[in-house]
Protein backbone atom coordinates (compact mmCIF):
# COMPACT_ATOMS: atom_id res chain seq x y z
CA UNK A 1 0.00 0.00 0.00
CA UNK A 2 2.86 2.36 0.81
CA UNK A 3 4.13 2.16 -2.78
CA UNK A 4 0.65 2.92 -4.06
CA UNK A 5 0.26 5.86 -1.71
CA UNK A 6 3.39 7.44 -3.12
CA UNK A 7 1.69 7.46 -6.49
CA UNK A 8 -1.67 8.77 -5.30
CA UNK A 9 -3.17 11.26 -7.72
CA UNK A 10 -3.56 14.83 -6.60
CA UNK A 11 -7.09 15.01 -7.77
CA UNK A 12 -9.14 17.87 -9.11
CA UNK A 13 -9.41 19.45 -5.72
CA UNK A 14 -5.74 20.22 -5.53
CA UNK A 15 -5.96 22.92 -8.19
CA UNK A 16 -7.79 26.68 -7.44
CA UNK A 17 -8.09 28.55 -10.57
CA UNK A 18 -7.04 25.81 -12.77
CA UNK A 19 -6.01 24.44 -9.55
CA UNK A 20 -5.75 23.56 -13.14
CA UNK A 21 -5.46 23.89 -7.16
CA UNK A 22 -2.32 28.02 -4.21
CA UNK A 23 -3.07 31.15 -0.94
CA UNK A 24 -4.12 34.67 -1.86
CA UNK A 25 -5.20 36.49 -4.92
CA UNK A 26 -2.75 37.28 -7.71
CA UNK A 27 -0.85 40.52 -7.42
CA UNK A 28 -2.87 43.60 -8.40
CA UNK A 29 -6.12 41.74 -7.80
CA UNK A 30 -8.42 41.91 -4.79
CA UNK A 31 -9.05 38.62 -2.97
CA UNK A 32 -11.96 36.73 -4.46
CA UNK A 33 -15.02 36.30 -2.29
CA UNK A 34 -15.62 32.88 -0.79
CA UNK A 35 -18.67 31.09 -2.22
CA UNK A 36 -21.96 31.36 -0.36
CA UNK A 37 -23.63 28.03 0.44
CA UNK A 38 -27.02 27.42 -1.18
CA UNK A 39 -29.11 25.72 1.50
CA UNK A 40 -31.99 25.23 -0.96
CA UNK A 41 -29.78 22.84 -2.93
CA UNK A 42 -28.39 21.14 0.16
CA UNK A 43 -25.14 23.07 0.65
CA UNK A 44 -23.74 23.71 4.12
CA UNK A 45 -20.45 25.41 5.01
CA UNK A 46 -18.03 23.45 7.18
CA UNK A 47 -16.48 25.06 10.28
CA UNK A 48 -13.52 27.29 9.33
CA UNK A 49 -13.95 26.28 5.71
CA UNK A 50 -12.51 29.43 4.16
CA UNK A 51 -9.41 29.17 6.37
CA UNK A 52 -9.07 25.54 5.29
CA UNK A 53 -9.19 26.61 1.65
CA UNK A 54 -6.49 29.25 2.15
CA UNK A 55 -4.34 26.81 4.12
CA UNK A 56 -4.69 24.19 1.44
CA UNK A 57 -3.79 26.68 -1.27
CA UNK A 58 -0.66 27.69 0.64
CA UNK A 59 0.44 24.07 1.07
CA UNK A 60 0.00 23.37 -2.64
CA UNK A 61 1.73 26.59 -3.68
CA UNK A 62 4.74 25.65 -1.55
CA UNK A 63 4.82 22.22 -3.20
CA UNK A 64 4.73 23.75 -6.70
CA UNK A 65 7.52 26.21 -5.90
CA UNK A 66 9.64 23.41 -4.44
CA UNK A 67 9.00 20.93 -7.25
CA UNK A 68 9.53 23.18 -10.28
CA UNK A 69 12.02 25.75 -11.47
CA UNK A 70 10.89 29.11 -12.81
CA UNK A 71 9.87 28.76 -16.43
CA UNK A 72 8.83 25.13 -16.05
CA UNK A 73 6.05 25.18 -13.45
CA UNK A 74 3.36 22.60 -14.10
CA UNK A 75 -0.12 22.06 -12.71
CA UNK A 76 -0.16 20.48 -9.28
CA UNK A 77 -2.90 18.12 -10.41
CA UNK A 78 -3.10 16.47 -13.79
CA UNK A 79 0.25 17.95 -14.92
CA UNK A 80 0.65 15.48 -17.79
CA UNK A 81 -1.51 16.22 -20.80
CA UNK A 82 -2.17 13.46 -23.28
CA UNK A 83 -3.31 16.18 -25.63
CA UNK A 84 -5.44 19.27 -26.16
CA UNK A 85 -7.81 18.93 -29.09
CA UNK A 86 -10.20 21.19 -30.93
CA UNK A 87 -13.82 20.11 -30.68
CA UNK A 88 -17.44 21.07 -31.23
CA UNK A 89 -20.03 20.84 -28.47
CA UNK A 90 -23.50 20.66 -30.01
CA UNK A 91 -26.51 20.84 -27.72
CA UNK A 92 -29.31 18.48 -28.72
CA UNK A 93 -32.04 20.00 -30.86
CA UNK A 94 -34.73 18.84 -28.45
CA UNK A 95 -34.34 19.20 -24.70
CA UNK A 96 -36.80 19.08 -21.85
CA UNK A 97 -37.51 22.63 -20.66
CA UNK A 98 -36.04 21.86 -17.24
CA UNK A 99 -32.66 21.12 -18.88
CA UNK A 100 -32.61 23.99 -21.39
CA UNK A 101 -30.68 26.40 -19.16
CA UNK A 102 -27.31 28.12 -19.28
CA UNK A 103 -25.25 26.85 -22.20
CA UNK A 104 -27.81 24.14 -22.96
CA UNK A 105 -29.66 26.09 -25.64
CA UNK A 106 -31.33 23.55 -27.97
CA UNK A 107 -29.44 23.29 -31.26
CA UNK A 108 -26.60 25.58 -30.16
CA UNK A 109 -23.03 24.63 -31.18
CA UNK A 110 -19.94 25.88 -29.32
CA UNK A 111 -16.31 25.57 -30.41
CA UNK A 112 -14.27 23.99 -27.63
CA UNK A 113 -10.84 22.96 -26.41
CA UNK A 114 -10.65 19.61 -24.61
CA UNK A 115 -7.66 18.58 -22.48
CA UNK A 116 -7.16 14.89 -21.71
CA UNK A 117 -4.77 14.30 -18.82
CA UNK A 118 -3.17 12.01 -16.27
CA UNK A 119 -3.82 12.66 -12.59
CA UNK A 120 -0.48 11.63 -11.12
CA UNK A 121 1.43 14.64 -9.72
CA UNK A 122 4.60 13.31 -11.40
CA UNK A 123 4.35 14.29 -15.11
CA UNK A 124 7.00 11.72 -16.01
CA UNK A 125 5.06 8.66 -14.89
CA UNK A 126 4.44 6.16 -17.73
CA UNK A 127 0.85 5.95 -18.91
CA UNK A 128 0.56 2.22 -18.23
CA UNK A 129 0.55 2.85 -14.49
CA UNK A 130 -2.96 2.90 -13.08
CA UNK A 131 -4.23 6.36 -12.27
CA UNK A 132 -7.03 8.85 -12.46
CA UNK A 133 -7.54 10.38 -15.90
CA UNK A 134 -9.09 13.72 -16.63
CA UNK A 135 -11.21 15.30 -19.35
CA UNK A 136 -11.63 19.08 -19.19
CA UNK A 137 -13.88 20.88 -21.67
CA UNK A 138 -13.60 24.60 -22.34
CA UNK A 139 -16.51 25.98 -24.35
CA UNK A 140 -15.82 29.18 -26.29
CA UNK A 141 -18.08 32.03 -27.37
CA UNK A 142 -20.29 31.73 -24.29
CA UNK A 143 -21.92 35.11 -23.63
CA UNK A 144 -22.96 36.37 -20.21
CA UNK A 145 -21.24 37.45 -17.01
CA UNK A 146 -19.32 34.63 -15.32
CA UNK A 147 -18.98 33.79 -11.63
CA UNK A 148 -15.20 34.14 -11.27
CA UNK A 149 -14.49 37.72 -10.18
CA UNK A 150 -11.21 38.01 -12.07
CA UNK A 151 -12.74 36.84 -15.34
CA UNK A 152 -16.33 38.10 -15.29
CA UNK A 153 -16.35 39.14 -18.94
CA UNK A 154 -14.57 36.12 -20.37
CA UNK A 155 -16.53 34.07 -22.86
CA UNK A 156 -15.67 30.55 -21.70
CA UNK A 157 -17.44 27.82 -19.73
CA UNK A 158 -15.48 24.89 -18.28
CA UNK A 159 -16.67 21.37 -17.45
CA UNK A 160 -14.12 19.29 -15.50
CA UNK A 161 -14.39 15.52 -15.16
CA UNK A 162 -12.39 12.52 -13.99
CA UNK A 163 -12.47 8.81 -14.76
CA UNK A 164 -14.19 7.83 -11.52
CA UNK A 165 -17.74 8.77 -10.42
CA UNK A 166 -16.68 9.48 -6.82
CA UNK A 167 -13.96 11.74 -5.43
CA UNK A 168 -11.50 10.50 -2.80
CA UNK A 169 -12.06 13.28 -0.26
CA UNK A 170 -15.45 13.34 1.41
CA UNK A 171 -15.40 17.02 2.40
CA UNK A 172 -13.01 19.86 3.35
CA UNK A 173 -12.36 18.59 6.88
CA UNK A 174 -9.13 16.67 6.18
CA UNK A 175 -7.95 18.46 3.03
CA UNK A 176 -5.04 20.42 4.54
CA UNK A 177 -3.67 17.39 6.40
CA UNK A 178 -3.89 15.26 3.26
CA UNK A 179 -2.10 17.73 0.97
CA UNK A 180 0.53 18.49 3.62
CA UNK A 181 1.35 14.79 3.85
CA UNK A 182 1.26 14.36 0.09
CA UNK A 183 3.67 17.23 -0.49
CA UNK A 184 6.08 16.10 2.22
CA UNK A 185 9.48 14.56 1.43
CA UNK A 186 8.99 12.26 4.41
CA UNK A 187 7.97 8.65 3.78
CA UNK A 188 6.58 8.61 7.32
CA UNK A 189 4.27 11.53 6.53
CA UNK A 190 3.02 9.78 3.41
CA UNK A 191 2.48 6.58 5.37
CA UNK A 192 -0.03 8.48 7.50
CA UNK A 193 -2.27 9.24 4.51
CA UNK A 194 -4.59 6.22 5.01
CA UNK A 195 -5.16 7.31 8.61
CA UNK A 196 -5.84 10.90 7.52
CA UNK A 197 -8.35 9.75 4.93
CA UNK A 198 -10.07 6.85 6.68
CA UNK A 199 -11.04 3.45 5.28
CA UNK A 200 -13.69 4.53 2.76
CA UNK A 201 -11.67 7.38 1.29
CA UNK A 202 -8.49 5.27 1.11
CA UNK A 203 -10.36 2.48 -0.68
CA UNK A 204 -11.74 4.98 -3.20
CA UNK A 205 -8.29 6.46 -3.78
CA UNK A 206 -6.75 3.04 -4.32
CA UNK A 207 -9.51 2.19 -6.79
CA UNK A 208 -8.79 5.39 -8.70
CA UNK A 209 -5.05 4.79 -8.52
CA UNK A 210 -5.11 1.30 -10.02
CA UNK A 211 -7.42 1.89 -12.99
CA UNK A 212 -5.84 1.49 -16.43
CA UNK A 213 -7.20 2.72 -19.75
CA UNK A 214 -6.24 2.15 -23.38
CA UNK A 215 -7.50 5.33 -25.06
CA UNK A 216 -8.56 8.60 -23.38
CA UNK A 217 -11.27 9.20 -25.97
CA UNK A 218 -12.86 5.80 -25.30
CA UNK A 219 -13.04 6.29 -21.53
CA UNK A 220 -16.03 7.47 -19.54
CA UNK A 221 -15.66 10.54 -17.34
CA UNK A 222 -17.80 11.96 -14.53
CA UNK A 223 -18.03 15.07 -12.40
CA UNK A 224 -17.76 13.43 -8.97
CA UNK A 225 -18.99 16.67 -7.41
CA UNK A 226 -22.29 18.45 -8.16
CA UNK A 227 -23.19 21.62 -10.02
CA UNK A 228 -26.18 23.89 -10.28
CA UNK A 229 -28.40 23.93 -13.34
CA UNK A 230 -30.47 27.07 -13.78
CA UNK A 231 -31.14 29.99 -11.45
CA UNK A 232 -34.13 31.03 -9.40
CA UNK A 233 -36.76 28.81 -7.78
CA UNK A 234 -36.47 26.07 -10.43
CA UNK A 235 -32.71 25.59 -10.09
CA UNK A 236 -31.51 22.05 -9.44
CA UNK A 237 -28.35 20.16 -8.52
CA UNK A 238 -26.82 17.92 -11.16
CA UNK A 239 -23.71 15.93 -11.97
CA UNK A 240 -22.49 15.38 -15.51
CA UNK A 241 -20.64 12.79 -17.54
CA UNK A 242 -19.05 12.23 -20.96
CA UNK A 243 -18.71 8.93 -22.79
CA UNK A 244 -17.84 7.65 -26.24
CA UNK A 245 -20.66 7.32 -28.76
CA UNK A 246 -19.22 3.87 -29.54
CA UNK A 247 -18.72 0.89 -27.24
CA UNK A 248 -15.51 -0.12 -29.06
CA UNK A 249 -12.42 -0.31 -26.86
CA UNK A 250 -8.79 -0.52 -27.94
CA UNK A 251 -6.84 -3.31 -26.22
CA UNK A 252 -3.98 -2.38 -23.93
CA UNK A 253 -0.73 -2.65 -25.92
CA UNK A 254 1.64 -5.51 -25.12
CA UNK A 255 4.66 -3.22 -24.87
CA UNK A 256 3.34 0.28 -24.19
CA UNK A 257 5.61 3.27 -24.42
CA UNK A 258 5.62 5.86 -21.62
CA UNK A 259 3.24 8.11 -23.59
CA UNK A 260 1.11 5.48 -25.29
CA UNK A 261 -2.15 7.27 -24.43
CA UNK A 262 -1.06 10.30 -26.44
CA UNK A 263 -0.06 7.92 -29.23
CA UNK A 264 -3.50 6.29 -29.08
CA UNK A 265 -5.12 9.71 -29.49
CA UNK A 266 -2.81 10.58 -32.39
CA UNK A 267 -3.62 7.33 -34.19
CA UNK A 268 -7.36 7.64 -33.56
CA UNK A 269 -7.54 11.19 -34.92
CA UNK A 270 -5.47 10.25 -37.97
CA UNK A 271 -8.26 7.89 -38.98
CA UNK A 272 -11.22 10.24 -38.56
CA UNK A 273 -13.52 12.13 -36.22
CA UNK A 274 -14.35 11.08 -32.65
CA UNK A 275 -17.84 11.30 -31.18
CA UNK A 276 -18.69 11.58 -27.48
CA UNK A 277 -21.93 12.19 -25.60
CA UNK A 278 -22.40 14.71 -22.79
CA UNK A 279 -24.97 13.76 -20.15
CA UNK A 280 -26.43 15.33 -17.02
CA UNK A 281 -27.71 13.57 -13.89
CA UNK A 282 -30.36 15.57 -12.01
CA UNK A 283 -30.52 15.08 -8.26
CA UNK A 284 -33.79 13.28 -7.52
CA UNK A 285 -33.77 13.12 -3.72
CA UNK A 286 -32.37 14.83 -0.64
CA UNK A 287 -30.74 11.47 0.10
CA UNK A 288 -28.27 12.23 -2.72
CA UNK A 289 -25.72 14.28 -0.81
CA UNK A 290 -24.44 17.51 -2.35
CA UNK A 291 -21.69 17.95 0.26
CA UNK A 292 -20.32 14.38 0.31
CA UNK A 293 -17.95 14.01 -2.66
CA UNK A 294 -17.58 10.29 -1.89
CA UNK A 295 -21.29 9.80 -2.48
CA UNK A 296 -21.81 8.30 -5.93
CA UNK A 297 -25.30 9.02 -7.19
CA UNK A 298 -26.43 5.64 -8.44
CA UNK A 299 -28.03 5.71 -11.88
CA UNK A 300 -30.87 3.55 -10.59
CA UNK A 301 -31.79 6.43 -8.27
CA UNK A 302 -30.85 9.32 -10.56
CA UNK A 303 -30.64 8.50 -14.29
CA UNK A 304 -28.46 10.37 -16.77
CA UNK A 305 -29.94 12.27 -19.72
CA UNK A 306 -28.03 13.09 -22.89
CA UNK A 307 -27.98 16.83 -23.61
CA UNK A 308 -25.17 17.31 -26.13
CA UNK A 309 -22.84 15.65 -28.62
CA UNK A 310 -19.10 16.33 -28.70
CA UNK A 311 -17.36 16.01 -32.06
CA UNK A 312 -13.57 15.94 -32.10
CA UNK A 313 -12.65 16.35 -35.77
CA UNK A 314 -9.78 14.57 -37.45
CA UNK A 315 -6.69 16.63 -36.65
CA UNK A 316 -3.01 16.80 -35.81
CA UNK A 317 -2.69 18.09 -32.26
CA UNK A 318 0.76 16.96 -31.08
CA UNK A 319 2.73 19.95 -32.32
CA UNK A 320 5.09 21.99 -30.09
CA UNK A 321 2.93 25.08 -30.60
CA UNK A 322 -0.27 23.34 -29.54
CA UNK A 323 1.44 21.67 -26.59
CA UNK A 324 2.60 25.10 -25.35
CA UNK A 325 -0.90 26.50 -25.85
CA UNK A 326 -2.30 23.56 -23.89
CA UNK A 327 0.17 24.08 -21.05
CA UNK A 328 -0.87 27.73 -20.70
CA UNK A 329 -4.59 26.99 -20.57
CA UNK A 330 -6.30 27.23 -17.20
CA UNK A 331 -9.31 25.12 -16.36
CA UNK A 332 -11.50 25.65 -13.31
CA UNK A 333 -15.12 24.74 -12.57
CA UNK A 334 -15.58 28.41 -11.63
CA UNK A 335 -15.14 29.49 -15.25
CA UNK A 336 -18.90 29.31 -15.32
CA UNK A 337 -22.20 31.04 -15.84
CA UNK A 338 -24.34 31.41 -12.69
CA UNK A 339 -26.58 28.72 -14.19
CA UNK A 340 -23.71 26.24 -13.78
CA UNK A 341 -22.39 27.27 -10.35
CA UNK A 342 -20.20 24.58 -8.71
CA UNK A 343 -21.73 23.10 -5.55
CA UNK A 344 -20.40 21.40 -2.42
CA UNK A 345 -17.41 21.83 -0.14
CA UNK A 346 -14.81 20.38 -2.50
CA UNK A 347 -15.88 22.76 -5.26
CA UNK A 348 -15.82 25.71 -2.86
CA UNK A 349 -12.23 24.85 -1.94
CA UNK A 350 -11.36 24.61 -5.60
CA UNK A 351 -12.38 28.22 -6.20
CA UNK A 352 -9.63 29.40 -3.86
CA UNK A 353 -7.03 26.81 -4.78
CA UNK A 354 -7.46 26.86 -8.56
CA UNK A 355 -7.32 30.65 -8.66
CA UNK A 356 -4.12 30.83 -6.64
CA UNK A 357 -2.28 27.95 -8.30
CA UNK A 358 -3.05 29.10 -11.80
CA UNK A 359 -1.72 32.57 -10.94
CA UNK A 360 1.43 31.09 -9.38
CA UNK A 361 2.07 28.81 -12.34
CA UNK A 362 1.72 31.59 -14.89
CA UNK A 363 3.83 33.95 -12.78
CA UNK A 364 6.65 31.37 -12.49
CA UNK A 365 6.50 30.73 -16.23
CA UNK A 366 6.22 34.44 -17.10
CA UNK A 367 3.18 33.56 -19.19
CA UNK A 368 0.14 35.75 -19.64
CA UNK A 369 -2.95 34.28 -18.03
CA UNK A 370 -5.95 34.77 -20.24
CA UNK A 371 -8.83 32.81 -21.65
CA UNK A 372 -8.80 31.92 -25.36
Language model region names:
Residues 1-21:
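Gram-negative bacterial Sec-dependent N-terminal signal peptides
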